[in-house]
Amino acid sequence: MKEQKQSGRLTDTITPLPFKGVIFDMDGTLIVSTESDYFAWKKIFTNYGKKLSYEDYQPLLGIRSANVIKEYIGITGEEDVKRILKEKFDYFVELITANPIKPVEAAEAFLKSLQSHPVKVALATSSRKEKMQMVLQQLNFLQYFDAIVTGDEVENSKPAPDIFLKAAERLGLSAKDCMVVEDGPIGVAAAKNAKMKCVAIAETHRADKLHQADVVIDSYENADFIEICQKLASSP
């Protein structure tokens, strides 16, 4: 994670920002991982006598992996779940070793732009810690975050608000002072359940599937943080 210092960060001296913290989801929001994740899950489902089409996979996005195993594969024993989690992770590693993860277009530029504003930045991902570390180290993205929360650190997965509330807590901020950046309906619902304003990026889902978000953007290309803040602040 980035060093805890503010000396190199500019501040907004004209109009105070309506938010003190920005909380990002990871998969689909910052990194392009859906295809690799789908094929890893498809192999797991096949191994345990289940089928998984891409259409059936999409509603799983944002759900903690252990919950997918319990609720969709039907295996609930804790040791079995741990074993399958490792199998899935190993498949995922194989896939991204052959085809390295890429960032969502212009995501890094947007993260860098936040360094020009007096805001803290957190990552709140349903992914397990080992996956998060591997992917963000590969992309050199850890430097952009003041706090990180992974799916194995909270009791309830999205759409429960736990992960975003924990991220706000680690930033030392209240929920009302934080905005969330998400890419999926389940994540947007979690942000709203946390009573946080949410901007959704239409990367893995069509804009009409993200209607619960306060603001929807097509991409980070030309996305202006101040303008987004103003739109969020004026939304109902």
Predicted regions and their residues:
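Asp-based, Mg2+/Mn2+-dependent phosphohydrolase catalytic module
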Residues: 2-20, 112-115, 128-236
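N-terminal helical cap/lid subdomain that shapes the substrate entry/recognition surface
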Residues: 4, 8, 15-109, 113-117, ...
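Conserved short-loop catalytic and cofactor-binding motifs
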Residues: 29, 56-57, 95-98, 120, ...
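Conserved SAM-binding loop
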Residues: 30, 103, 121-125, 156, ...
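Small/polar loops that bind or transfer phosphate-bearing groups
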Residues: 32-33, 60-61, 123-124, 182, ...
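Residue-level detector of anion-binding/catalytic polar loops
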Residues: 51, 120, 197
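Short, flexible loop segments at the rims of nucleotide/cofactor-binding pockets, characterized by
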Residues: 97-102, 126, 193-195
